[in-house]
Amino acid sequence: MTRFLICSFALVLLYPAGIDMYLVGLPRIAADLNASEAQLHIAFSVYLAGMATAMLFAGKVADQSGRKPVAIAGAVIFIIASMLCSRATDGSLFLTGRFIQGIGAGCCYVVAFAILRDTLDDRRRAKVLSLLNGITCIVPVLAPVLGHLIMLKFPWQSLFYTMIAMGIAVCLLSVFILKETRPATCSSTSRPQQNAESLLNRFFLSRLAITTLSVSVILTFVNTSPVLLMEMMGFDRGEYATTMALTAGISMAVSFSTPFALSVFKPRTLMLTSQGLFLAAGIVLSLSSSHAVTLFGLTLICAGFSVGFGVAMSQALGPFSLRAGVASSVLGIAQVCGSSLWIWLAAVIGFNALNMLIGILIGCSMVCILLLMTIQPAAHYEKIHHQSRS
């Protein structure tokens, strides 16, 4: 079991590392490539677009051909793309590399969740996903620090050399440590069961909506945080970085506490708590009259996401013993596209940063509480495949 956890954690961590590692070098990258920082800032969106593209096919391929080949392919693609970024001589080539890098990270991300679905029951999976969420929260804090230390001695290309090393490590884990977890029953004889695992069943759709709205909340918070903290509250860059590090610390603390809470409380209780914290955050931010109250509202967002997201993801994957890859892909695509759609729509409507955040907090909490109260899992809604194949 340990091998699956190590490999899954490594596969997932390529995704945030690919986002956060290079940010500290952005000014120097822009100068060397004769591009503006504004032009290169779309590298974030390009990376997510690459991930979404990979998710369109990675899940289905993983269900048909196995988790291990897709994990290896994703790591190799990530390595090649990182090398392309390090050799880029203009902005267009750099953005192309970032898109391909997103494809590699997307393949690995989908496979990681499929592996956890294959090897863990619902309660253990919820605990592991909560821990994984906490570890993921560490990356946005540590990756820029590591990037800064690297750039004290080396050029910006070394940031992508570091990503190449990470990709090689994941590839080696996938080749030599990871064992195939795709259910051995995935064959023509299992076609009726595969067809029965419909992506249109109401329980899956409810958890799809909950996870998508929750990701929309946290990404809206991240997207609006510079405006909220630096423009509206007057923080300088140092104070902004410190505040974001503290919120990440809260996320980590809650994520690491959630597995213990699952031993005491029902998953539904934690998900309702999550949405209650979102609702409270929306109310606090809408009524806030001081910086301290606003900061308290922001901490509620981080705590709410951390206590409920892993549990909701676990339940979403629960009904799929033979189509875990496809289900993981659908969840990933919905979360990336749904959150991007909300941020774009709110900007088009003309919401300011604070109202954009308050709107998604209150809307998310009300919809999700309704879904949690009305749609619950069946008594025996999942089948676990403990065996693995070399």
Swiss-Prot record:
Entry's transmembrane regions:
4-24, 42-62, 69-89, 93-113, 131-151, 158-178, 199-221, 245-265, 269-289, 293-313, 316-336, 353-375
List the Pfam families hit by this protein, alphabetically. MFS_1 (PF07690)
Alphabetically sorted, this entry's keywords are: Cell inner membrane, Cell membrane, Membrane, Transmembrane, Transmembrane helix, Transport
Question: Which domain of life does the UniProt lineage start with?
Answer: Bacteria
Q: Which GO terms describe its molecular function?
A: transmembrane transporter activity
Coiled-coil segments: none
Localization of this protein? Cell inner membrane
Instruction: List the CDD domains hit by this protein, alphabetically.
Output: MFS_MdfA_MDR_like
The primary location reported for this protein is membrane
Topology in the lipid bilayer is annotated as: Multi-pass membrane protein
Entries under SUPFAM superfamilies matching the protein:
MFS general substrate transporter
The UniProt entry's GO CC annotations, sorted and at most eight, read: plasma membrane
The record's PANTHER family line, in alphabetical order, gives:
MAJOR FACILITATOR SUPERFAMILY MULTIDRUG TRANSPORTER MFSC
Report the sequence similarity comment from the record.
Belongs to the major facilitator superfamily. DHA1 family. MdtL (TC 2.A.1.2.22) subfamily.
Q: What is this protein called?
A: Multidrug resistance protein MdtL
Q: Which gene encodes it?
A: mdtL
